[in-house]
Swiss-Prot record:
Substrate binds at E28, N284. Its EC number is 2.1.1.8. It is found in: Cytoplasm. GO terms for cellular component: centrosome; cytoplasm; cytosol; nucleoplasm. Monomer. Inactivates histamine by N-methylation. Plays an important role in degrading histamine and in regulating the airway response to histamine. Its main location: cytoplasm. Belongs to the class I-like SAM-binding methyltransferase superfamily. HNMT family. This is Histamine N-methyltransferase. S-adenosyl-L-methionine binds at G60, E89, Q94, S120, I143. InterPro entries: HHMT-like (IPR016673), SAM-dependent_MTases_sf (IPR029063). It comes from Mus musculus (Mouse). One of its GO terms (biological process) is S-adenosylmethionine metabolic process. Transmembrane segments: none annotated.
Amino acid sequence: MASCMRSLFSDQGRYVESFRRFLNNSTEHQCMQEFMDKKLPGIIARIGEAKAEIKILSVGGGAGEVDLQILSKVQAQYPGICINNEVVEPSAEQIVKYKELVAKTSNMENIKFSWHKETSSEYQKRMLEEEEEPPKWDFIHMIQMLYYVKDIPATLKFFHGLLAASAKILIILVSGTSGWEKLWKKYGSRLPRDDLCQYVTSSDLAQILDDLGIKYECYDLVSTMDITDCFIDGNENGDLLWDFLTETCNFSKTAPLDLKAEIMKDLQEPEFSVKKEGKVLFNNNLSFIVVEANV
């Protein structure tokens, strides 16, 4: 029965849909918005000093919702200054959505957008193969994308080397205190692994940055994901959330019954979720890691 399970990443359409359901059922973007409102202005306070243009690199920009939040904060900090925003994103579908979002968003006049349909590894390879030195950036952000990188230390070292003076990297990924950390550690070996994705949290990232000798600050914010529908048999929304939780395509239909029963039981335990007003809210806490350029 276990052999019937396959990685969610083997079906791009279902992955995108399950990710959309995750966003609709979680406070992920609200949590990010809170960080952008309260913390980001201080973080970007010096990135554009005495510059005619601010260069921003979005690695794994997705459909652009969070990117545009970031850009609005940069615009507010540096009114009238031109912004060059380059996006590295492997999904053609997400790039189309990103472009549609830009087209219907006002106050984008001083921002130049360019998109590259490639992974961060492909971007890195392309930059290293070009004869000229790779461009330097004033702000690089990597939002919920390090799970899809094979060599995280090498990736961090490469992008850290692209920072201009006073520049920063913002990395967002799940916290080491989240339910994801516990779920992956307990069940990862029993779920279909894909070399496209690896289990990594802020705890792992902090260790990697320490080993590289790179300075950083880490902020944790509370986020939840409503997984109540996962406990309703045959619920379409619940089935897609199951897929996202386990990174397994059609998990509800293909997983061994004992595995699903075990995970279902655990997901209701306090170390994974809280129960509130009849809902089961999975711990989706996020970490925001700010990496500084070398002085």
